[in-house]
Amino acid sequence: MRSIIVIGGGAAGLMAAIKAAEQGASVTLLEANEKPGKKLLATGNGRCNFTNVVQEKQYYRGSDPEYAWQILQQFPMQDTLQFFSRLGIYARNRNGWLYPNSDQAAAVLEVLLMEASHRKVKIKTRESVCEILPGSEGWSVKTKTWEYGADAVIVACGSPASNVEGATDWG
């Protein structure tokens, strides 16, 4: 069985961990905060704007908007809607911004954590990653307290795009 470490316990990290586990991988998710999903709870003023109807290249900013656009083409809006509806989260359209019907970011986090648990994703909190190194048989991921080994590593730790507690250069 392939082992995968996911760095980051936000929406992207949880979704990556779930998708990897669905494919049969043994997944460990490392989250620096005391709980996963801390920044997720703040999205959309606590309502969780989880995708948008209009996704066009000109709406993405940053040092490499083309790269963001390419990534989004691999998991478009319809795939996002299917992923969440399979977990029982249905979208409400508000002027092109899609929110869960409940208008609660906490509901989105809850179903992501439930699915991760169902898929046997091991979630390690308060694990701040310091170093990622290639090894002879995969990867070594060092935290302040432990060293983990895996066949592959997914870095999904976001960014300090907003002044939200827990945001660092590592996400």
Report each predicted region and the residues it spans.
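Glycine-rich active-site loop/strand segments that organize a redox cofactor
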Residues: 45-95
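Mobile, glycine/GP-rich and aromatic-enriched active-site lid/loop segments adjacent to catalytic centers
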Residues: 86-111, 118
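Predominantly flavin-linked oxidoreductase catalytic cores and closely associated redox partners
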Residues: 106-107, 111-171
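Short glycine/serine/threonine-rich phosphate/pyrophosphate-binding segments
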Residues: 13-15, 157
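Glycine-rich FAD pyrophosphate-binding loop
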Residues: 5, 21-45
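Beta1/beta-strand and adjacent pyrophosphate-binding region of the FAD-binding site
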Residues: 1-12, 28
